[in-house]
Regions:
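Envelope-exposed proteins and targeting segments
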Residues: 61-66, 73-76, 129-131, 151, ...
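Solvent-exposed loop/turn segments at secondary-structure junctions
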Residues: 86-87, 138-142, 177-181
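Bacterial N-terminal signal peptides
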Residues: 8-19
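Terminal "cap-and-tail" regions of soluble proteins that handle hydrophobic small molecules
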Residues: 26-44, 154-249
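Glycine-rich portal/gate segments that line the openings of hydrophobic small-molecule binding cavities
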Residues: 100-152
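Short solvent-exposed beta->alpha transition segments
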Residues: 87-110, 229-244
Length: 249
């Protein structure tokens, strides 16, 4: 989540940044869904539920992006979701994007979109069809001081039957909350513009997934050649090799 930022540089910062804030467990009452996507509240720890609650209770923006389609079959699709550092390496190898992911621990990654936003992405919960993320990062603009916001992303995905073209469809619910009072006031005034910027930035990430899936389907040999550089263990590298080999004609 450019030229469009020059008109409203303040609003661009809304999309990615995040920092945790304290929240009492007693106040964490989560809704059953976000933008129509079921929220896996019961699978969250008390502290993670507080993080989600403090964003979605009174967000600066709330938007839905998608559905976006990728031609990948489910096993490879889920592998790349579980190992975004491998997906980022493949995106660079296939000249799709230069985004960076670095694993910091279980379900925790350092992410840098190379567009002013960098920070920690956490996977809070996952099921067969939903994944809940919390993004904590810092965004820098040449026209404005660094800004922090807190972002909750809830993704829903489904496999399409061969009769519908196969592959996966994904929909993303994005909630942001700004901690800077000046920015928060401006967002309240320019809410429609802010929602449009957030949607555009989130759509960029969804399009990256679609473009990477298309590139892998077209160029599996080039993807296999990139395997030695993958920041993966031997077992994960072998698993990815198996998935990519299945893409060969």
């Amino acid at each position: 989540m450019g030229p469009i930022c020059r008109l409203t540089p303040i609003l661009v910062a809304v999309v990615f940044l995040a920092t945790p804030s304290p929240c009492g467990a007693a106040s964490c009452e989560l809704p059953r869904s976000l933008r129509g996507i079921p929220l896996p509240a019961r699978s969250l720890s008390a502290s993670d539920a507080c993080l989600v609650d403090s964003v979605v209770r009174d967000p600066a923006t709330a938007s839905t992006v998608g559905p976006a389609h990728t031609p990948l079959e489910r096993p490879l699709f889920e592998f790349l979701l579980d190992h975004p550092e491998a997906g980022a390496e493949l995106a660079r190898a296939l000249a799709v994007d230069d985004i960076v992911f670095r694993r910091e621990g279980p379900d925790r990654f350092w992410a840098d979109d190379k567009d002013g936003s960098a920070g920690t992405l956490r996977l809070l919960s996952k099921s067969e069809t939903e994944r809940l993320y919390y993004f904590d990062c810092r965004h820098e603009e040449p026209f404005y001081w660094p800004v922090r916001v807190r972002v909750v992303l809830l993704m829903s995905s489904e496999s399409l039957p061969p009769s519908a073209g196969g592959g996966q469809n994904s929909t993303l619910a994005v909630y942001t909350r700004i901690e800077d009072p000046v920015i928060r006031t401006l967002i309240a005034v320019f809410g429609r513009v802010a929602r449009r910027v957030v949607s555009r930035k989130a759509a960029k990430g969804m399009k990256l997934s679609s473009r990477l899936g298309a590139a892998l389907s077209r160029r599996p040999i080039d993807a296999l050649r990139a395997l030695p550089a993958m920041p993966l263990g031997a077992v994960e590298r072998k698993e990815l090799e198996t998935h990519l080999t299945r893409l060969l004609p």
